[in-house]
Swiss-Prot record:
The modification N-acetylserine is found at residue 2. Belongs to the peptidase T1A family. Gene3D superfamilies: Glutamine Phosphoribosylpyrophosphate, subunit 1, domain 1 (3.60.20.10). The keyword Ubl conjugation applies. One of its GO terms (biological process) is ubiquitin-dependent protein catabolic process. Keywords: Acetylation, Cytoplasm, Isopeptide bond, Nucleus, Proteasome, Ubl conjugation. Component of the 20S core complex of the 26S proteasome. The 26S proteasome is composed of a core protease (CP), known as the 20S proteasome, capped at one or both ends by the 19S regulatory particle (RP/PA700). The 20S proteasome core is composed of 28 subunits that are arranged in four stacked rings, resulting in a barrel-shaped structure. The two end rings are each formed by seven alpha subunits, and the two central rings are each formed by seven beta subunits. The catalytic chamber with the active sites is on the inside of the barrel. The proteasome is a multicatalytic proteinase complex which is characterized by its ability to cleave peptides with Arg, Phe, Tyr, Leu, and Glu adjacent to the leaving group at neutral or slightly basic pH. The proteasome has an ATP-dependent proteolytic activity. It comes from Arabidopsis thaliana (Mouse-ear cress). This is Proteasome subunit alpha type-3. It is found in: Cytoplasm; Nucleus. SUPFAM superfamilies: N-terminal nucleophile aminohydrolases (Ntn hydrolases) (SSF56235). GO terms for cellular component: apoplast; cytosol; nucleus; peroxisome; plant-type vacuole; proteasome complex; proteasome core complex, alpha-subunit complex; vacuole. The modification O-acetylserine is found at residues 214, 220.
C-alpha cells in the first residue's frame, strides 16, 4: 500500500489521483489488525463482545478494557489502538453529559453517534491532525428501543442489526447473518457472540485472548453493564463445546 500511496499519503488532506485518502486507509488497517469486536441487536436489547488479545502473560485479568460505559444507557466497544479509543470514549462521555445538562434528558443513541462521528471526522480534515486508529461499536437503549451503531476512522456512522470490526470482521459478519436476531433474546445473544469470537480466534496465529462482554437489556434494567460472570462462563463453555464438536466433525 505504501508504494502505491507514495507522495499522496503524507497528509490526511491529500487525495490521490483515483480519489483515495491513504491516511484514512492506514487508520482502517490499524483497526483490521485488532482483535475482533462483535455487536448485535436482539429483540430485547444489545450485546457486545470483544476478543481482547493479551499482550503479555504478566497482565492482570481485566486490564486494558475494550468495552466502556459512556452513559447509563449506552456503551462503546473499541477495536484498534486502545489509546485512541480512550479519547473517543472520553468525547462520548462528554457529549452525553453535555446533552443531559442542556436538555435534562438522556442523550438519544442516534444523537450521540452523530456527535461522536463528527468528532472523528474532524481529525480527517486538517493536516496537523491524524485520523483515529480505531473503530467503535456504540450500543444503547433509549425511547426508541435498542440501537446499534458503528463509527469508522473516516467518521462515517451507520445503524446496524449486527456489526463487526477487527481482523475477523468478514467471517464474523457471515456468522451474524445466519442468526435470527429479531427473535433472539440477549441471553441467547451472549452465547452466540461468544461462539462467533471463539470460532474466529486462531490459536496457531493469534495471541491468547480474554473474552469481554457487555449488554443493555431488560435484564440490566436498560443500563449498560458487564455480562454477569455466571452467564459469561456459561457462554464460554458453550462456545468451547461448539468448537470441539466442529473439530471432531
Amino acid at each position: 500500500m505504501s508504494s502505491i500511496g507514495t507522495g499522496y499519503d503524507l497528509s490526511v488532506t491529500t487525495f490521490s489521483p483515483d480519489g483515495r485518502v491513504f491516511q484514512i486507509e492506514y487508520a482502517a488497517k490499524a483497526v483490521d489488525n485488532s482483535g475482533t469486536v462483535v455487536g448485535i441487536k436482539c429483540k430485547d436489547g444489545i450485546v457486545m463482545g470483544v476478543e481482547k488479545l493479551i499482550a503479555s502473560k504478566m497482565m492482570l485479568p481485566g486490564s486494558n478494557r475494550r468495552i466502556h460505559s459512556v452513559h447509563r444507557h449506552a456503551g462503546m466497544a473499541v477495536a484498534g489502538l486502545a489509546a485512541d479509543g480512550r479519547q473517543i470514549v472520553a468525547r462520548a462521555k462528554s457529549e452525553a453529559r453535555s446533552y443531559e445538562s442542556v436538555y435534562g434528558d438522556a442523550v438519544p443513541v442516534k444523537e450521540l453517534s452523530e456527535r461522536v462521528a463528527s468528532y472523528v471526522h474532524l481529525c480527517t480534515l486538517y493536516w496537523w491532525l491524524r485520523p483515529f486508529g480505531c473503530g467503535v461499536i456504540l450500543g444503547g437503549y433509549d425511547r426508541d428501543g435498542p440501537q446499534l451503531y458503528m463509527i469508522e476512522p473516516s467518521g462515517i456512522s451507520y445503524r446496524y442489526f449486527g456489526a463487526a470490526i477487527g481482523k475477523g470482521k468478514q467471517a464474523a459478519k457471515t456468522e451474524i447473518e445466519k442468526l435470527n436476531l429479531s427473535e433472539m433474546t440477549c441471553k441467547e445473544g451472549v452465547i452466540e457472540v461468544a461462539k462467533i469470537i471463539y470460532k474466529l480466534h486462531d490459536e496457531a496465529k493469534d495471541k491468547a485472548f480474554e473474552l469481554e462482554m457487555s449488554w443493555i437489556c431488560e435484564e440490566s434494567k436498560r443500563e449498560h453493564q458487564k455480562v454477569p460472570d455466571d452467564l459469561l462462563e456459561e457462554a464460554k463453555t458453550a462456545a468451547k463445546t461448539a468448537l470441539e464438536e466442529m473439530d471432531a466433525d
